[in-house]
């Protein structure tokens, strides 16, 4: 599962996920991409589940790039613990996703196979996505 090797601080503020993605919004590595239309958080488990679904479908052909990385820690307090006594411990890591962000890219397979693989991956994700094709010259 993806998570930072080490961080400067263990805990982060919750923050607000606003705006649209301008960086990481184009197909840069492969021929096809899965782009987020909705906004939300992707956990490292969701990223891995979608990657497995795609990898299983394309079998041995093609190459997949993961364009997002979960670098934000989410803390939780244990069950049945009274309020107060400080912030809970980091339990998992998430990637904050804005609309327009490229999530995955794929190359070395034909379009119909890529579409189906991304459809299977999108079912594992908590936000709306769309299939995009890299246009030559961009």
UniProtKB/Swiss-Prot annotation:
The keyword Cell membrane does not apply. One of its GO terms (molecular function) is tRNA binding. One of its GO terms (biological process) is translation. SUPFAM superfamilies: Ribosomal protein L16p/L10e. InterPro entries: Ribosomal_uL16, Ribosomal_uL16_bact-type, Ribosomal_uL16_CS, Ribosomal_uL16_dom, Ribosomal_uL16_sf. It holds the Pfam family Ribosomal_L16. CDD domains: Ribosomal_L16_L10e. Keywords: Ribonucleoprotein, Ribosomal protein, RNA-binding, rRNA-binding, tRNA-binding. One of its GO terms (cellular component) is cytosolic large ribosomal subunit. The keyword Protein biosynthesis does not apply. Binds 23S rRNA and is also seen to make contacts with the A and possibly P site tRNAs. NCBIfam families: rplP_bact (TIGR01164). Belongs to the universal ribosomal protein uL16 family. Part of the 50S ribosomal subunit. HAMAP family: Ribosomal_uL16. This is Large ribosomal subunit protein uL16. It comes from Nitrosomonas europaea (strain ATCC 19718 / CIP 103999 / KCTC 2705 / NBRC 14298). The lineage of its organism: Bacteria, Pseudomonadati, Pseudomonadota, Betaproteobacteria, Nitrosomonadales.
């Amino acid at each position: 599962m993806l998570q930072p090797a080490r961080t400067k601080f263990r805990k982060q503020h919750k923050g607000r996920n606003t705006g649209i993605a301008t960086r990481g919004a184009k197909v840069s590595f492969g021929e096809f991409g899965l782009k987020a239309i909705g906004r939300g958080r992707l956990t490292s488990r969701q990223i891995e589940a979608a990657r497995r679904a795609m990898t299983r479908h394309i079998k041995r052909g093609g190459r997949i790039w993961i364009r997002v990385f979960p670098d934000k820690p989410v803390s939780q307090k244990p069950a049945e613990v009274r309020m107060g006594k400080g912030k809970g411990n980091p339990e998992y890591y998430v990637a904050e996703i804005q609309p327009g962000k490229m999530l995955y890219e794929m190359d070395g397979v034909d379009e119909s196979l890529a579409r189906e693989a991304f459809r299977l991956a999108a079912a594992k994700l908590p936000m709306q996505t769309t299939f995009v094709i890299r246009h030559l010259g961009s």
